[in-house]
Amino acid sequence: MNDFPALAALTIHDVKNRLNLLVQHAERKGDTEALRLAMEAAATLTRLLQAYKAGTGQLRAQVDAYAPADVVAELAAEFRAQSALRLELELGEAPVLAYYDEALVRMVLQDVLYNAMRHARAAVRVSVRTVDGDLEFSVADDGPGYPPDMLGVPAMAVPADGSGTGLGLYLARHVAELHANGARHGEVSLGNDAGAVFRLCLPL
């Protein structure tokens, strides 16, 4: 069936919308566990839909001026509503405005924060700053860190196991690549330093 990928994408979109309704219902009921599970499921479906678009060349960056500190503060509020982990924000070096696709960057950071929420022992740190002409978003946790095989994954490798972390990383690298300034493109880097460290760098 030649139209199956498009049909699957439409189905994912529909189910994601239904899950968003479930999220709203859980919020009204104050059911934090149901809220967390529904939001994770909705985020996974969003990644699948965006992965389909990336694989078919339909994913585009809609770049405009945004305040990086604002999106981080909004995601921090969501994080704190779902987790007892300590969340530290380092926004003092964040530029007032920067040009990027806010929706795509939000999706990437939300996914990374969900992973940090699952693996951190006690704390997660999020920072935004400018480094060598790039806008850098960094998320670090105090968990076990990234496994060695993930640190060596090729830049645009498609996750063979369909894992949430692998799919999120695949999308993050596509999102980074969509942001360009001349010959310079965005990059994603992973590292371990007392836990996992994720960096998304976008050229300014």
Each language-model region and where it sits:
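Glycine-rich phosphate-binding loop
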Residues: 162-174
